[in-house]
Amino acid sequence: MGKGCKVVVCGMASVGKTAILEQLLYGSHTVGAETSDTQEDIYVASVETDRGVREQLRLYDTRGLREGLDLPKHFFSVADGFVLVYSVDCLESFKKVEVLKKEIDRSRDKKEVMVMVLGNKCELRERRQVDQDTAQQWARGEKVKLWEVTVTDRSTLIEPFTSLTSRLTQPQSKSAFPLPGRKSKGTPSNDI
């Protein structure tokens, strides 16, 4: 198991961030159960990657964002990845995800941080406010992976987190240091 990755889970209040994590990790979330506001929690998960290796994931469950309340700035510097969550039955929550993605891009280099988006409550078809095609088009433009999920079906939660963990823990393919006997780009050659 590697060093572990820090992943910040964020989005508006009541989109189901805590429900997603509790259902994913414990299979214990009851839809409709009364919940209290999350202040901030950390969950530790051991996730099997698509390479068959178990990796540790530290999931930072953040307080739901409301009008005038932003994601605390320290999360931008400590996170290896972000999971942005919206509810398909709340257009405002999707717009907040768009804003969060811009904030992440402003504070971090796109190549150094992994972002994925979850559209939660996809079973609420009759109350849908966020069009799936529109959301996917936005995600493609932002170069992020988007999944629609529901806590009523735990299997919809497993693939996104397995994929995220696999991408965060990919072995480096190239050494940052040149190997003896090989020419590296930008190094003058003595060949004539």
From Swiss-Prot:
Residues 1-192 are annotated as: Small GTPase-like. Signal peptide: none annotated. One of its GO terms (biological process) is Ral protein signal transduction. GTP binds at residues 11-18, 61-65, 120-123. One of its GO terms (cellular component) is cytoplasm. A motif (Effector region) lies at residues 35-43. In contrast to other members of the Ras family, the members of the KappaB-Ras subfamily do not contain the conserved Gly and Gln residues in positions 13 and 65, which are replaced by Ala and Leu residues, respectively, and are therefore similar to the constitutively active forms of oncogenic forms of Ras. This suggests that members of this family are clearly different from other small GTPases proteins. Belongs to the small GTPase superfamily. Ras family. KappaB-Ras subfamily. This is NF-kappa-B inhibitor-interacting Ras-like protein 1. The gene is nkiras1.
